[in-house]
Amino acid sequence: MVVKVGIAKLGNIASGVMGELLLDERADREDMITFMATSGTKLQPEDIERVVSNMKAWGPDFCIVVSPNGVLPGPTQAREDLAAAGIPCIVITDDVTTKKEQFEALKASNFGYIIMKADAMIGARREFLDPIEMADYNGNLVKVLALTGAFRKMQMELDKVIDQVKAGKKGADLALPKVVMTSDKAVDGEFSNPYALAKARAAYEIAQSVAGVNVKGCFMTKEWEKYIPIVASAHEMMRQAMLLCEEARTLEKGVDAVIRKPHKKTGEIVSKTALISKPE
């Protein structure tokens, strides 16, 4: 069978940039297809309704609802509307664990979730953030999530759900992920060199802390002379996290130990480390 995977992208976080691409990296899988509906950059009710209506019309076996601050009313309503239509949902969002009441409600619900703690909010001040700065920040963040192992763990969790659908499960019978992507979880099993692991773990910890700095610069500081250097420093932190990730991967390359786990056309995941070798 061919599994239908929906991606409802509401606003933007770095995890949403790569969502469906991580499941079909060479666009040659024959066991699943994806459909993305996006609200664009905004989270207005009419934008979200457009996404939900298009997703309902397509009728996926399950839907990934990816957004910043996934406990906001808009994303919450979107997944509830999809669930009411019989579509199982997995929430992918940035760190909402500090929002105790809403996060407890999410944990107690039937929704799956993957909380990407390092997918930190951007320094969205007009005096600092132009289109190029925005793209540069997201590029650095994507690299952090990729090279620490966070993206692989996210992809593996989603592939588990695809495998369940292929095995005949559907609807409420699907076991959906409930994962908080900490630094330890991200780097687990990704590195043979302990120094590479330490660098990647440091990168993830730095990226996690960027959100707090940007919250201070975007919401807690009123004087522009003060908030500009605050958000600029947050972006410099993300750049340093990215550089640590590159150093970690270079160390792994030096001992020919970079882990690669491609999909076969059937969806089976194979693995290799030595560069000049075939995945098995």
Swiss-Prot record:
Keywords: Methanogenesis, One-carbon metabolism, Oxidoreductase. It catalyses: 5,10-methylenetetrahydromethanopterin + oxidized coenzyme F420-(gamma-L-Glu)(n) + 2 H(+) = 5,10-methenyl-5,6,7,8-tetrahydromethanopterin + reduced coenzyme F420-(gamma-L-Glu)(n). Belongs to the MTD family. GO terms for molecular function: ferredoxin hydrogenase activity; methylenetetrahydromethanopterin dehydrogenase activity. This is F420-dependent methylenetetrahydromethanopterin dehydrogenase. GO terms for biological process: methanogenesis, from carbon dioxide; one-carbon metabolic process. It comes from the Archaea. Catalyzes the reversible reduction of methenyl-H(4)MPT(+) to methylene-H(4)MPT. Pfam families: MTD. Its EC number is 1.5.98.1. InterPro entries: MTD, MTD_sf. Pathway: One-carbon metabolism; methanogenesis from CO(2); 5,10-methylene-5,6,7,8-tetrahydromethanopterin from 5,10-methenyl-5,6,7,8-tetrahydromethanopterin (coenzyme F420 route): step 1/1.
